[in-house]
A protein has these predicted regions:
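Walker A/P-loop
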Residues: 27-34, 68-106, 153-154
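Conserved D-loop-proximal element of ABC-family nucleotide-binding domains
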Residues: 145-147, 174
Length: 181
């Protein structure tokens, strides 16, 4: 099921797929508490739960569809779209903290097909050996070429990874149709 949320506060749109049939699974990454002392202040102060997340209450407030999808671990591949600083990366991090899933963050500017293949191989192992799903957060996903975008399609179609794209550009224009669908 594909949902689109207009974000009036940041003039962006959050596109996401929601699996309504999945039961609630929650957990916390044991290593997320040990933040690097040398990380940027914004990363150290970043909200870790939906209750700490400020703003966007029309989509992540109590009882709202996106919040329910995150809390029940039924959020599928998604694209977060909006201007810098509106909470796209923070919301993706909250998804990682709220669900019991593995979370891998890549930047489209510095990552290539080889990096994606490594993530997919590790995700496939996690799924087969431990039954643990993997989210791939790709910052600035609009900067990926068609070849790079096509490299994750088989893994998405087979359910090996869940994709969260973060972009400041309209994904309907800047990304390949196969990824957006």
């Amino acid at each position: 099921f594909f949902e689109s949320f207009n974000c009036a506060a940041c003039h962006g749109i959050i596109y996401c797929k929601v699996n309504y049939s999945k039961g609630k699974v929650s957990g916390m990454d044991l290593f997320s508490a040990g933040m690097n002392k040398h990380a940027p202040l914004a990363d150290r102060m970043r909200p870790r739960t939906l209750d700490e997340f400020v703003g966007q209450q029309h989509i992540v407030g109590k009882g709202k569809l996106l919040r329910r999808a995150i809390e029940t671990d039924s959020l599928q591949s998604s694209i977060f779209f909006g201007p810098p600083g509106c909470g796209k990366t923070t919301l993706a991090s909250i998804v990682a903290n709220t669900t019991g899933s593995e979370f891998v963050k890549l930047n489209a500017v510095t990552s290539g097909v080889k990096d994606v293949r490594e993530v997919i191989a590790a995700a496939e192992d996690n799924l087969k050996l431990y039954g643990r799903e993997t989210y791939l957060l790709l910052d600035e996903c609009h900067r990926w070429s068609k070849a790079q975008s096509d490299s994750i399609l088989p893994a998405l179609e087979r359910g090996i990874i869940k994709f969260i794209g973060s972009t400041t550009e309209n994904p309907m224009v800047s990304m390949t149709g196969a990824i957006v669908s």
